[in-house]
């Protein structure tokens, strides 16, 4: 009986418009129409005015259009602080004449556009929850316990979007565009938690978003940007309907230095395997302390705390895995416990 097979490629980038490495994959045999998603780390500031995300997205849209391919999920996360390396992670899938044997599964979906007045509110949570369920169906994953990472690109509020909403007589959750990034990430993460049965949707209200950090998802990774108005969703997990050498597991870091949990997750994966990708979330602990010691990431008026966190957690993970092309996304509201976050590890078994 046929099955689906996933492929994962980590490609270096010399800039947000450098898609040559991915085009080289196409030249060497990867079918462009088999690509379902591209995750990128671009070298902007990762904040509201980070235009490297949109630049990279447009570069990939142009590339895929040359091959007649449409509908690829293109999710760009800005910020390669510290020694993090700009890169792309390309996810592809194909049907093969091999029985399913429980392997990495990939599913994608997009939600309808989110009205600005719904951003950071309960409506966004419910919209994302439906999108995650759709992506799980696309991946052939029935059990939420088999989901190990849910990557979401969500919108933010710009001055123009705020003005348009208010001109229509509607109110928005905040007038602070930077704060809107956190609200959007947080609501999207809670949507993941609802979809996976980690939280009861009836128990969450607008006031809980980015305030009740005891509510979180074990595997949500959300990144906000001004280059979209909907949500792009990628679900990664394990499914018996898939075959191939790729496997995934994940850890939930309890704080920014919780290397132990990450190492334990790696140990659960096949020993005779090579690292295919590492995907992680990072945030400054809102308590202002890590393991009881004070940090100053939240007190820096020049550099956003999310930028500090990406650099810090990136260094921790680089020390564990020995690579710097790590997908580390900042801002982990409701994505793991406060100050922590999920880390997904994808490996390829040696043949």
From Swiss-Prot:
Binding site for substrate: 53, 77-78, 185, 223-224, 310, 329-330
Phylogenetic lineage: Bacteria, Pseudomonadati, Pseudomonadota, Alphaproteobacteria, Hyphomicrobiales
Presence of keyword Magnesium: yes
Function summary: Responsible for the hydrolysis of cyanuric acid, an intermediate formed during catabolism of s-triazine based compounds in herbicides such as atrazine and polymers such as melamine. Catalyzes the hydrolytic opening of the s-triazine ring of cyanuric acid (2,4,6-trihydroxy-s-triazine) to yield carbon dioxide and carboxybiuret, which spontaneously decarboxylates to biuret.
Alphabetically ordered keywords of this record: Hydrolase, Magnesium, Metal-binding, Plasmid
GO MF term set: cyanuric acid amidohydrolase activity; metal ion binding
Catalyzed reactions per annotation: cyanurate + H2O = 1-carboxybiuret + H(+)
Binding site for Mg(2+): 283, 332, 335-337, 340
Written domain comment of the UniProt record: The monomer structure is formed from three repeating units (RUs) that share the same structure as one another. The monomer, the active site and substrate all possess threefold rotational symmetry, to the extent that the active site possesses three potential Ser-Lys catalytic dyads. It is possible that any or all of the three active-site serines may act as nucleophile (albeit only one can do so per catalytic cycle).
Site annotation Important for substrate specificity: residues: 306
Presence of the UniProt keyword Metal-binding in the record: yes
E.C. number: 3.5.2.15
Residues covered by region (RU B): 103-240
HAMAP family in UniProt: Cyc_amidohydrol
Region named RU A: 1-96
Segments for region (RU C): 246-351
Catalytic residues in the record: 153, 223 (nucleophile)
Highest taxon of the lineage: Bacteria
Protein source organism: Rhizobium leguminosarum bv. trifolii (strain WSM1325)
Protein's name according to its UniProt entry: Cyanuric acid amidohydrolase
Quaternary context: Homotetramer.
Family affiliation: Belongs to the cyclic amide hydrolase (CyAH) family.
Pathway annotation from the record: Xenobiotic degradation; atrazine degradation; biuret from cyanurate: step 1/1
């Amino acid at each position: 009986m046929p099955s689906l097979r996933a492929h994962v490629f980590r490609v270096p980038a010399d800039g947000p418009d450098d898609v040559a490495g991915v085009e080289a994959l196409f030249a060497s045999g990867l079918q462009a129409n088999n690509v379902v998603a591209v995750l990128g780390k671009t070298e902007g500031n990762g904040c509201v005015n980070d235009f490297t995300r949109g630049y990279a997205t447009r570069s990939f849209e142009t590339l895929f259009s040359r091959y007649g391919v449409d509908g690829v999920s293109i999710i760009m996360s800005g910020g390669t602080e510290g020694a993090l390396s700009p890169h792309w992670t390309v996810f592809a899938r194909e049907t093969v004449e091999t029985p399913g044997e429980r392997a990495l599964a990939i599913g994608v979906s997009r939600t309808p556009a989110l009205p600005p007045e719904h951003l950071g509110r309960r409506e966004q949570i419910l919209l994302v929850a439906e999108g995650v369920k759709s992506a799980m169906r696309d991946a052939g994953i029935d059990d939420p316990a088999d989901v190990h990472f849910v990557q979401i690109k969500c919108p933010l509020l710009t001055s123009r979007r705020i003005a348009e909403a208010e001109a229509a007589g509607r109110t928005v959750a905040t007038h602070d565009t930077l704060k809107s990034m956190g609200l959007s990430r947080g609501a999207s993460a809670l949507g993941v938690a609802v979809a996976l049965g980690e939280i009861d949707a009836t128990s969450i209200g607008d006031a809980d978003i980015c305030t009740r950090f005891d509510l979180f998802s074990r595997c949500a990774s959300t990144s906000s940007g001004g280059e979209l108005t909907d949500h792009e969703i990628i679900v990664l997990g394990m499914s018996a309907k898939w075959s191939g050498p790729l496997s995934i597991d994940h850890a939930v870091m309890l704080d920014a230095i919780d290397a132990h949990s990450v190492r334990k997750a790696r140990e659960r994966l096949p020993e005779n395997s090579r690292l295919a990708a590492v995907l992680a979330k990072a945030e400054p602990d809102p308590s202002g302390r890590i393991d009881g010691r004070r940090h100053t990431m939240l007190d820096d008026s020049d550099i956003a705390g999310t930028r500090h966190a990406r650099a810090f957690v990136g260094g921790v993970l680089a020390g564990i895995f020995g690579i710097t092309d790590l997908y580390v996304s900042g801002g982990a509201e409701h994505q793991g416990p406060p100050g922590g976050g999920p880390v997904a590890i994808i490996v390829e078994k040696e043949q």
